[in-house]
Every structure is written in structure tokens, then in C-alpha cells.
Amino acid sequence: MKKYKTGIINVTGYAGLELARILESHPSVELCSVTGRSLAGKKLSDVFPYLHRLDLPITENLEGQVDVAFLALPHKEGAALVPALLEKGMRVIDISADFRLKDPALYQAWYGFEHPCPGLLEEAVYGLPELKRKDIAGARLVANPGCYPTSAILGLVPAFKSDLIEPSAIIDAKSGLSGSGRTPTVKTIFCEADEDVCAYSIGTHRHQPEIVQELCRASRGVIPRVTFCPHLVPMSRGILSTAYARLKQPVTDEEVKEIYRQFYKDEPFVKVTAEPPHTRYTRGTNMCFIYPVVDALNEQLIVISCIDNLVKGAAGQAVQNMNIMLGLAETEGLEAMATLP
């Protein structure tokens, strides 16, 4: 059976390493090339022994021709590479934010750089399969969603599309420390992060315009007012988002749950739960668990959603997008369930 060739540009970050782990056991693809400038010349399995079956050399540049190239570079660093990859006939999935926003001016405002290839922003497909499956299938370039936006958007889209809520929402989200990347900072080292919870980037987080952009599409072009407050919590993986929105009219708890169940009934990686979900349910999986509930006294909808920020929030969703682009079963390579404890 033919195996599709894949490569990872910058394998050494958490998202790149998670990609390597998932792709190694994928039955229909072969991981052929991985890059990482600081570790070039070493073997992936030597530097990261837990990837013991991956004896690939880490190189400075992608070697050979691949069918799908995954970009796992930090924001601003990968966009300029994309035109050359596309010219070589490769399909590209970018895990950074470089192609998520459609308005090039937003990159200057939120990321502090002028986009090097704004002409590709319109072509890039926002890679949230539950909403963009048909567009992803034919795409050359997919912008993998951010971790916070994945959790928040999946939690709120059914309510916006069903016209259940006013066009505004408050999103309180809590993330494990891996969401801040592998480069250590004062706020992520053990002695600072352990037994501590803190909010950060209140009202200024870079994922906010991404959330607004996609919820706007779900609410028939009405630009929603989104208040987004992220927090760091002392765990390695996981995001739990709690979203609050005012109901347009009275609705029962069961009616809302049925709307959500129907919206996601055919989605292999979204489960509407009967009880509030835990982040540990998602650990190492591509699942998103969602719990909608009505606060009847205050006429509010509350939606809790949780994901593994490195899987459904990054590498797993990238592989899900790859499966769709290559015409493979969407769940291929992503069937793992969480471990307990």
C-alpha cells in the first residue's frame, strides 16, 4: 500500500514532537524528514528517547519531496517559507498563527509584523474540520487553529449558528504550561508555576481576533463582542474553557443539550457530555468534550469545553486536517483514548 510522505519543519518544539509521535504510528503515512536548526546532525531518537522508533536525522532544511509539509515554527518565522513549498507541489499545514487571520492588518496589530505573503491569506483554509471539512479537502494551504480558539469556537459555534445567544461572549480559559512552549520562562519554571494559577494577556491575547473572526462567520456576519481571559494552571497539558453568553429567549437545559448533540452527532472527535468534563479525559487524544448548560435564573448559556492543547489544539488537529486533504479516513492515526490515572 502506498504511503504518503510527510515532513516536519521544526520538530523540536512540543507541537512538532507531538506530530512526530502521532505520525510514527499512522498507517498511511511515512515521516521522512524533520528539521531543527539547533539540533541538526543528531538523531531524533537520541535527543528524545521516548521517540525510540524514530531514528531520523534532524536536518537544517527539509530533505527531499514530501506530500505534506507541517510547519511547526514560532509565529512570524514560517510564513516566508510557504510559497516555495507550494511551488514544489507540497501541501502545507501551518501550526503557527501565520495564516489564520484573513486581514493582513491584524498581524501588525496583534503579532507585531507585516505579513510577508498577504496574497496567500485568502487562499489559506482555516483548519477546523468540524466547520470547514469541504474546504480543507481541496486546500493547498491549511492554517491549523490555535489551541484556545479550538476549544472556545467548538464550544460556542452551535449556539451562534442556532441563534440562541446574543452576539457577545465571555470566555474564561485555563491552559496547562505546555501551551507556552518548550522555551523556559520565569512564569513556566516549576518553582514559579507549581501551586499557582494566574491570568495573563487579559483582553490582549493574540488568539482573541482569531476567535472573533470565526464566531463572526458563525453568526451570519455579525461581529461578536468577545471578552477573552486566559489563565495558566500548574498542569502539563489541557485546556478547559468556560464561555458565558446571554440567551435571546428562554430555553430549557435539555433543549440546548439536544441542539448541541444534533450539531455534533456525526463528529468523531467531539462529544457532548452529560456532566462537566475534565481535562484528563482528553490527555493524549484528539477529543473535544463539551458540556452546555442553562443558567435559567440569569438567562445565560454556560458552555464548558476541554481539549488536549497539544493534540486537538495542535498536532492531532493537524493530522486530522492531513487525513481530510489526502482523502483518508478522518480518524486514521488518531484513535487513541486517554489514560487514567
Curated annotation (Swiss-Prot):
Recorded catalytic activity of this chain's protein: N-acetyl-L-glutamate 5-semialdehyde + phosphate + NADP(+) = N-acetyl-L-glutamyl 5-phosphate + NADPH + H(+)
Q: Name one Pfam family in it.
A: Semialdhyde_dhC_1
Active site, renumbered: 147
- Stored InterPro entries: AGPR_AS, AGPR_type-1, NAD(P)-bd_dom_sf, NAGSA_dehydrogenase, Semialdehyde_DH_NAD-bd
- Which GO MF terms are attached to this record? N-acetyl-gamma-glutamyl-phosphate reductase activity; NAD binding; NADP+ binding
Which pathway does this chain act in? Answer: Amino-acid biosynthesis; L-arginine biosynthesis; N(2)-acetyl-L-ornithine from L-glutamate: step 3/4
Q: What is its EC number?
A: 1.2.1.38
Keyword annotations for this protein, in alphabetical order, are: Amino-acid biosynthesis, Arginine biosynthesis, Cytoplasm, NADP, Oxidoreductase
Biological process according to GO: L-arginine biosynthetic process
Q: Which CDD domains match?
A: AGPR_1_C, AGPR_1_N
Q: Where in the cell is it found?
A: Cytoplasm
GO cellular component annotations of the record: cytoplasm
Role this protein plays: Catalyzes the NADPH-dependent reduction of N-acetyl-5-glutamyl phosphate to yield N-acetyl-L-glutamate 5-semialdehyde.
Q: Record's family?
A: Belongs to the NAGSA dehydrogenase family. Type 1 subfamily.
The name under which this protein is listed is: N-acetyl-gamma-glutamyl-phosphate reductase
